[in-house]
From Swiss-Prot:
Signal peptide as annotated in the record: none
Domain of life: Viruses
Family label: Belongs to the mimivirus BTB/WD family.
Domain BTB: 16-89
Protein name stated in the entry: Putative BTB/POZ domain-containing protein R225
Species name: Acanthamoeba polyphaga mimivirus
Length: 527
């Protein structure tokens, strides 16, 4: 159909059979000469009006009182293939008014365009009033939580809605793409920092989320801190003369990060508030060093290097070809674990890097150390080996206090391992010729009991993502076509897929933790 010619008939009042008068609260009156058949096909409101025995169904002239006459006209003209915008409202306000106009016309409101905007304290009520007039679903509730000011009066919300906010806001994946930071989960996606300029992104960079200050720390050759609430960034001069990853980790005080500088074999501590480097220490022995005077070469192979804090926050471990445990305050070495070859001394075959993953047990007594040779369970207090299992693992996460899930190369599946009894209790093998990449990651969303695999792909260059339901071990496969971006979008919006070549993403389970705690306390005070 030639929409331009059809629209020209509207402008010229040619072959039209309805005069539509739009009036809004600002007394803006617009007269449109339109075709009933076009309105009937594109709009449920007019379809109902024209197909039933309403008084107005056969009239040649119709008057409508709408939220905004100009935006309603934009919507109607879109039926004719036009995309013009008739107002100079800010983008966020135009979209809110458009939603109300769509709702009046019985059209599906375009809520999800709102995820492109960052609403501040001054316009949050506008967002809330718009949504309140339409209704709520999980995506909308996520959008409200994301934009809600920490000091907002929670009395305005029903308890059921506050409980749902807690349910949908416990698990996100944050990533950088197209000059913005965004977050997504199985309910929604939204922008948290937009319009980034004067910023050279590096594919070897990594990001950290700081919940207390609502900031994103970007670590590469430079360190950049992005404040989500103020939309202001601050940047250091180049302090990391490195060519590969730094593996930064947030300290428990949420004011410092610790990262590994592979050029100098140095552990570095950086204050994200003052944007100053606090100090550097030799990773091999914990001795303090002067970076300006260091001309040595690195001792550790940085591929697969990780830094993990103990649950108590008083120690951290650096994992490379072994494990070194340090005291947080002094950076002195507490113990070492150098064993990476199992007792059987059987190399389980090629794995891209030796070290794949590491984490503390929920009971805090053990460290799970996943290498290409197997899984080692280590006593976290002294570094002694407790048990080991032969497995070519990629990533590991907790399921319960006693059970962990291991994403494997072998049969491209998942092993459920009871480490207390040193036994495999169940396995899931994928049947779609899947080949997990080195950057694939398995993680548990404890808020809805589902297991995520991020970054999976098959050998035919068709990429898949999975959401595994632990209760019955069934899994949902989300088909995506390979596209030239740093992430892949699934049609059903269950999850996005991060490109294995782009590691600038992070799992966030404490997004707006201050607000979450406030909501929890408010609910408890009422109950």
């Amino acid at each position: 159909m030639n929409y331009d010619k059809l629209f020209q008939n509207v402008i010229n009042n040619k072959l039209t059979d309805l005069e539509l008068v739009l009036t809004d609260p600002e007394n803006n009156n617009l007269v449109l000469n339109l075709h009933k058949i076009v309105l009937d096909i594109n709009c449920p409101y007019f379809e109902t009006l024209f197909s039933n025995n309403f008084i107005d169904s056969n009239m040649k002239k119709l008057n409508l009182f709408v939220e905004d006459s100009y935006i309603t006209r934009d919507i109607i003209y879109n039926f004719y293939g036009q995309t013009n915008r008739s107002t100079d409202y800010p983008d966020w306000l135009y979209q809110l008014k458009k939603i109300k106009c769509q709702n009046f016309l019985c059209m599906k409101p375009d809520f999800y365009r709102l995820s492109d905007f960052v609403f501040d304290k001054d316009n949050f009520d506008e967002l809330l009033n718009t949504i309140d007039s339409i209704g709520y679903d999980d995506k909308v509730v996520s959008l409200i939580f994301k934009n809600m000011p920490v000091d907002y009066d929670l009395v305005k919300f029903p308890i059921e809605l506050l409980n749902r906010m807690l349910d949908v806001s416990g698990f996100y994946i944050m990533y950088y793409d197209n000059n913005r930071f965004s977050m997504y989960n199985q309910y929604c996606e939204f922008v948290v920092f937009d319009g980034i300029s004067d910023f050279d992104y590096s594919p070897n960079s990594q990001i950290i989320y700081v919940p207390n200050s609502q900031e994103i720390v970007y670590v590469s050759e430079k360190i950049v801190v992005f404040n989500i609430e103020t939309q202001i960034s601050r940047i250091t001069d180049s302090i990391n003369p490195v060519s590969s990853k730094n593996y930064p980790t947030l300290c428990p005080d949420q004011e410092h990060i610790i990262y590994y500088n592979n050029k100098w074999d140095a552990i570095c501590k950086f204050n994200v508030k003052t944007m100053k480097l606090i100090g550097t220490w030799r990773a091999s022995n914990g001795s303090e060093i002067n970076m300006d005077e260091n001309n040595g070469t690195y001792f550790f192979d940085s591929i697969g290097c990780k830094i993990v804090f103990s649950p108590s926050g008083d120690k951290f471990v650096l994992i490379t070809d072994g494990i070194i445990c340090y005291d947080v305050k002094t950076i002195k070495v507490c113990w070492r674990f150098n064993k990476i070859v199992p007792l059987s001394r059987v190399d389980l075959g090629y794995v891209p890097t030796c070290i794949r993953d590491v984490m503390y047990s929920l009971c805090r007594k053990y460290i799970f150390y996943l290498t290409k040779y197997g899984l080692f369970v280590i006593n976290s207090s002294n570094g002694h080996l407790v048990s080991e299992m032969k497995v070519r693992g990629i990533s590991i996460c907790h399921i319960t206090c006693d059970i962990v899930a291991i994403l494997t190369y072998d049969n491209s599946g998942i092993i459920m391992y009871d480490y207390q009894n040193n036994m495999i209790i169940s396995e899931l093998n994928f049947s779609d010729n899947i080949c997990f990449g080195g950057e694939s990651k398995i993680c548990m969303n404890y808020f809805d009991g589902k297991l995520f695999i991020i970054g999976s792909n098959n050998t035919n260059r068709i990429d898949y993502n999975y959401i595994i339901n632990i209760s019955d071990f069934t899994y949902e496969k989300n088909f995506t076509e390979k596209i030239d971006k740093s992430y892949y979008v699934c049609d059903n919006d269950i999850i996005k897929y991060n490109n294995c070549c782009n590691n600038c993403f992070n799992i966030v389970t404490d997004f707006k933790s201050v607000l979450r705690d406030k909501i929890k306390n408010h609910i408890e005070s009422i109950n």
